[in-house]
From Swiss-Prot:
UniProt protein name: tRNA-specific 2-thiouridylase MnmA
Residues spanning the signal sequence: none
Function: Catalyzes the 2-thiolation of uridine at the wobble position (U34) of tRNA, leading to the formation of s(2)U34.
Residue ranges, annotated region (Interaction with tRNA): 175-177, 330-331
Its EC number(s): 2.8.1.13
GO cellular component: cytoplasm
UniProt-annotated location(s): Cytoplasm
Length: 390
């Protein structure tokens, strides 16, 4: 197995070294792309007993569909391993397509990859391995890391109550996919091996070439399989969400134009508004009830707080008092400092938190995930449900 960890101390903590591996059974989620192919090949090289599993997510061409299934099958043939295919089209339709559509209808900007990881990919893989006769691990080609919290090199100056397994950012910050994994449970983490967590994307390609994998030169897939499938998110929306004309208003109340459905807009959007105004205007909020798109100057987009719902604590027990975090509010955005305050609920098991930013933030977008980190450790995350003004 390649050793590329920058921090050699953490290397000894990595789950791949902690979980005794020789001849242990592992099921690798294969999408037909280079990342999951290399994951399977590296695990084999490392002595694991590997099987492939491809979830059939949608009808059609492309990596999520028939092309992905065929590529994954070919890879398994090359590697001489069993290939399993699960028809997950119904659950994908219900949990991703329908919920993404409902999100847009409600004026949110949904995050289909998180929905898929939460309710389809890892659910289905876990169910599959639990049914196996012997204890079976799970692997995917995500760029993130899982380590044991008992690792002595973990800094816990905040006195967090760590759970047994911690989820960490991928070592390659440009490829880090931990943001999409905030909904994982300890049950999944205890079985999960992420063989690419310590690699850079260039290293993945090099390794795939070294091992002669048929997917070594396959182009990078889109971040979003729905984009790859439909051509663009706009086309997905046109296909699924009904058009309902409404008004575009300045937050000062002045009507500036009309729109053909709030689903076509996202917070922070500047282009394509089709309105004339002396200074640049941006989408500030979407009012589903009144079917209004509100626009404002850049400064008016700045928010002080957001309410985060359905929070899942991945690596720590749910905090009962406020904690300081680094919050990432979009996949590609830099983490920002903030304070998380638990909001009371009747059962005392709050899943709602108020996130107060140290500096006001633009692009706080309901429907996107807010993921909380402390350095490399992903503490937990949830969905931005609303924001309050500056
Ligand atoms: N249809 C699927 N069936 C099983 N596992 C999947 C499927 N799609 C994705 N995965 C797993 O999830 C990981 C991350 O998926 P993502 O869609 O982000 O692909 P990716 O980063 O482009 O990886 P790849 O190069 O393997 O396609 C994949 O590496 C793979 O292990």
């Amino acid at each position: 197995m390649l050793k590329t960890l920058k921090d050699k101390k953490l290397e000894n903590c990595s789950s791949i070294n902690n979980k005794s591996k020789k001849q242990k059974h592992i099921v690798v989620g294969l999408s037909g792309g280079v990342d999951s192919s290399l994951s399977a090949a590296l695990l084999m090289e490392d002595g694991w007993k590997v099987e492939g599993l491809t979830l059939w997510l949608m009808k059609g061409e492309g990596s999520c569909c028939s092309e992905g299934l065929v590529d994954a099958a070919g890879l398994c043939e090359d590697l001489g391993i069993q290939h399993n295919i699960l028809d997950s089209r119904v659950i994908f339709e219900r949990e991703v397509i329908k919920k993404t559509t409902e999100g847009y209808e409600s004026g949110y900007t949904p995050l289909p990859c998180s929905m898929c990881n939460k309710n389809v990919k890892f659910e289905e893989m876990l169910k599959f391995v639990i049914k196996q006769k012997e204890f079976t691990y799970i692997a995917t080609g995500h760029y993130a890391r899982v380590i044991k919290s008992s690792c002595e090199h973990i800094n816990n100056s905040e006195n967090f109550q760590f759970k047994d397994f911690l989820l960490l950012r991928g070592a390659d910050r440009n490829k880090d996919q931990s943001y999409f994994l905030y909904s994982l449970s300890q049950e999944v983490l205890s079985r999960l091996i992420l063989p690419l967590g310590d690699l850079k994307k260039e290293e993945t390609r090099k390794e795939a070439l070294r091992l002669g994998l048929r997917t070594a030169k396959k182009p990078e897939s889109q971040d979003l399989c729905l984009v790859e499938h439909y051509g663009s998110m706009q086309k997905f929306i046109d296909n699924h969400v009904k058009t309902k004309n409404g008004e575009i208003k300045h937050i000062n109340g002045k009507t500036l134009g009309t729109h053909n459905g709030i689903q076509h807009f996202t917070i922070g959007q500047r282009k394509g508004l089709g309105i004339a105004w002396p200074e640049p205007l941006y989408v500030e909020s979407l009012d589903k009830q009144k079917n209004i798109v509100y626009v404002a100057n850049k400064n008016d987009l700045l928010k002080r707080e957001a309410i985060i719902k359905e929070v899942n604590w991945v690596s720590i027990e749910a905090p009962i008092k406020e904690i300081e975090v680094e919050a990432q509010i979009r996949y590609r955005s830099e983490p920002v400092k903030g304070i998380l305050v638990p909001l009371k609920s009747k059962d005392n098991l709050t899943k709602r938190f108020k996130l107060i930013f140290e500096d006001n933030q633009s692009s706080v977008t309901p429907g996107q995930a807010a993921v909380f980190y402390k350095g490399e450790i992903l503490l937990g995350g949830g969905l931005i449900s609303e924001f309050s003004k500056k």
